[in-house]
């Protein structure tokens, strides 16, 4: 039976269209320098001063531009972290039949929100029964880069105030950065909703507001932002493209 097309498949493919990173070192020692993605901010891990104006992505370089496909090696060198949308990266395959991600390079937890990054013990390793938080697991995995996506489970009601969401998300990102400061951290956009969704309390107005807040957060703290939502969104309607979500209209 042919599976319905899920946005996770296209999103995972789009993740390869980031700036090309360097290959991971053969040892556990940290790389001598940052990759091209964050070289301009790697010299200091302290946040830059907050700006009062909306950042211009083309000038500050926060939003990653489209590039040529970086290939399979880019995906394999990347640790994907997130909620059920990330879980689905292991369920969908590319044209060769290879899953976009595996248990070796993904930490995905169904229904997880940004506030649980530092508290939820959600990862364990082969041969051990000990559970680890995301930052703890990252320190053990020592990835070349991270693409992280939380936010779908932080949506609720009709408020467009992303203050609490950004605060907890930033705390999680900083904890990851402290645990393993030798990798690039790329924050992926909250994916768009289907107009025909089960939970009508969730709106694209809120998604857009939260994503705009993510761009500002990334700019102020030296992270990169991957606008993955643009490949999933119908420019004419503002909602997710037809047939790019499951029956609930959210995933």
Regions found by a protein language model. Give the residues of each.
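Gram-positive cell-envelope targeting signals
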Residues: 1-62, 146, 170-185, 210-214, ...
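Catalytic His-Asp segment of secreted/periplasmic serine-dependent ester chemistry enzymes
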Residues: 192-251
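Charged helix-capping and loop-helix junction motifs
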Residues: 162-172, 204-210
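Conserved SGNH/GDSL esterase-like catalytic core that processes O-acyl groups on lipids
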Residues: 72-167
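Basic, amphipathic N-terminal segments that precede the first structured/catalytic domain
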Residues: 34, 41-81, 86-90, 96
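Structured segments of extracytoplasmic/periplasmic soluble domains
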Residues: 84-88, 92, 137-140, 172-179, ...
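Active-site segments of SGNH/GDSL-like serine hydrolases
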Residues: 149-153, 175-208
């Amino acid at each position: 039976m042919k599976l319905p097309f899920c946005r996770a498949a296209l999103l995972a493919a789009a993740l390869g269209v980031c700036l090309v990173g360097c290959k991971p070192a053969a040892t556990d020692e940290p790389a001598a320098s940052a990759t091209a993605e964050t070289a301009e901010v790697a010299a200091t891990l302290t946040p830059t001063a907050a700006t009062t104006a909306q950042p211009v992505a083309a000038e500050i370089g926060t939003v990653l531009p489209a590039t040529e496909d970086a290939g399979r090696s880019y995906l394999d060198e990347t640790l994907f972290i997130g909620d059920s949308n990330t879980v689905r990266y292991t369920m969908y395959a590319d044209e060769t039949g290879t899953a976009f991600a595996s248990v070796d390079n993904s930490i995905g937890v169904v229904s997880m929100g940004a506030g649980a990054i530092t508290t939820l013990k959600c990862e364990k390793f082969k041969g051990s029964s000990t559970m680890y938080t995301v930052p703890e697991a990252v320190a053990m995995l020592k990835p070349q880069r991270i693409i992280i996506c939380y936010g779908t489970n932080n949506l609720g009601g009709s408020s467009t105030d992303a203050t609490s969401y950004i605060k907890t998300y930033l705390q999680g990102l900083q904890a990851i950065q402290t645990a393993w400061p030798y990798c690039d951290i790329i924050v992926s956009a909250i994916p768009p909703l289907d107009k025909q969704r089960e939970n009508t309390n969730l709106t694209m107005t809120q998604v857009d507001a939260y994503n705009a807040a993510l761009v500002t957060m990334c700019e102020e703290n030296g992270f990169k932002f991957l606008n993955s939502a643009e490949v999933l969104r119908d420019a004419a309607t503002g909602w997710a493209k037809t047939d790019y979500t499951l029956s609930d209209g959210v995933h």
